[in-house]
Amino acid sequence: KGEFRNIDPTKARVILVDGAEHPLPPFGEQLGHKTEEALAKLGVEMKMNAFVTDVDSEGVTLKYKSGEDERIESVCKVWAAGVSASPLGRALGEATGAEVDRAGRVTVNKDLTLPGHPEIFVLGDMMAFPGVPGVAQGAIQSARFAADTVAARLAGRKPRATEFSYFDKGSMATIARFKAVVKMGNTKMTGFTAWVAW
């Protein structure tokens, strides 16, 4: 309310569609429910456990995990879906015989190299590595690891580490003006305090 001067909030609907049970699944159930409460107070309608199966000029079609379908009439849509891997991943898999997961990410060794190809590193959201989400901190950490390994090889020394280990520095998401959620280790915050931390 008050954010978009040209939109009458009494005539508009904001509908969040998500395939998960609650918003922001990486933040856990507790913060997901807090997010749900905050969005509901803002008048956001939530369609959880639902996937978009069709979008056209007049609306959006959803399919719920339960199997039921729903049509939402809409002239304005905002798509903010997750990331999908680059087509380069599938091409790399086909060219080298490497395993590629459903999302198009390439399975890598513990040192982030392609199985059978120690000269090829696959990094960031193109790599399929257990416990590493497709976010910037995963990409940065994997790039630093690979850079150190390559530099060590060129200098004829051992790398600082022989296996990549991801360190989750935490996640933050802003929900609305002066409202956010933060998860850093065991610390969880919501509301204004989380927004200030963000």
Map each language-model feature to its residues.
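FAD-site-proximal beta/loop scaffold in flavoenzymes
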Residues: G59, I72-R144, D148-A152
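C-terminal, flexible cofactor-proximal segment of oxidoreductases
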Residues: S142-W198
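Hydrophobic/aromatic beta-strand patches that form the interior of the parallel beta-sheet core
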Residues: I15-V17, K47, V78, F121-L123, ...
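Alpha-helix termini
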Residues: K1-D8, S66-G67, R153, R157
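Cofactor-binding loop segments of dinucleotide-utilizing enzymes, especially the Rossmann-like FAD-
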Residues: G19, D125, R177
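A structured beta-alpha segment of the ubiquitous adenosine-cofactor-binding alpha/beta core
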Residues: V52, K63-E70
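Rossmann-like dinucleotide-binding cores of NAD(P)H-dependent redox enzymes
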Residues: K1-A50
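A conserved short coil-to-beta-strand element within the FAD-binding core of flavoproteins
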Residues: M48-G59
